[in-house]
Swiss-Prot record:
Required for maturation of 30S ribosomal subunits. This is Ribosome maturation factor RimP. It comes from Mycolicibacterium gilvum (strain PYR-GCK). Its main location: cytoplasm. It holds the Pfam family DUF150_C. GO terms for cellular component: cytosol. It is found in: Cytoplasm. The keyword Cytoplasm applies. The gene is rimP. The lineage of its organism: Bacteria, Bacillati, Actinomycetota, Actinomycetes, Mycobacteriales. Keywords: Cytoplasm, Ribosome biogenesis.
Length: 178
């Protein structure tokens, strides 16, 4: 994580301090800290903790993580601030194996090192390879195994209609919600 603070404000914790303070509590709750943004330019300043987990981040999880973060941050002597705990959002690039695992069953646009772009449904991830269910013809679905180190960029796409049961089955998520 790159240190991102829009302004210096004496007494506010650094990004590193926030991560060190919260990482253990979030991990025990089953979540990872993806990023911390400290915006000292706003009044009051904002501390934004971006978290994700294998179960996703629903409202109950956000409330629990906010409570945990608030308890930990309250141990510091800081000026007043606004705490926000949020998920990375759908437009976050998939950059780590865990991101692909969490996005299994979702549609993604994947740009490869050779310059080609594929759109497909994310399947199982194992041994640094992701299975991508691609539609090669109007109704012909194929599973392509793609090495994660061959991926330059991958972003989950917003969908407006449900995928076919066969597509979900090939992605390894039949019977699950995506």
């Amino acid at each position: 994580m790159a240190e991102r603070s829009t302004d210096f404000r004496p007494g506010l914790p650094s990004q590193r301090q926030v991560v060190e303070l919260l990482d253990g509590e979030f991990a025990r709750a089953g979540y990872d800290i993806e990023d911390v943004v400290i915006d000292a330019a706003t009044r009051p300043p904002r501390i934004v903790v971006i978290a994700d987990g294998d179960r996703g981040l629903d409202l109950d999880a956000v409330a629990e993580l906010s409570r945990l973060a608030s308890e930990q941050l309250d141990t510091l002597d800081t000026p007043p601030y606004v705490l926000e705990v949020t998920s990375p959002g759908v437009d976050r690039p998939l950059t780590e194996e865990k991101h692909y695992r969490r996005a299994q069953g979702r549609l993604a646009e994947v740009t490869l090192a050779d310059g080609s772009t594929l759109t497909g449904r994310i399947g199982a991830v194992q041994n640094a390879t992701v299975a991508l269910v691609v539609r090669e013809a109007r109704s012909n679905l194929t599973v392509r195994d793609i090495a994660l180190d061959a991926v330059v960029k991958a972003v989950v796409q917003v969908e407006f209609s449900p995928p076919s049961p066969r597509e979900l089955e090939l992605a390894g998520v039949s019977g699950k919600e995506t």
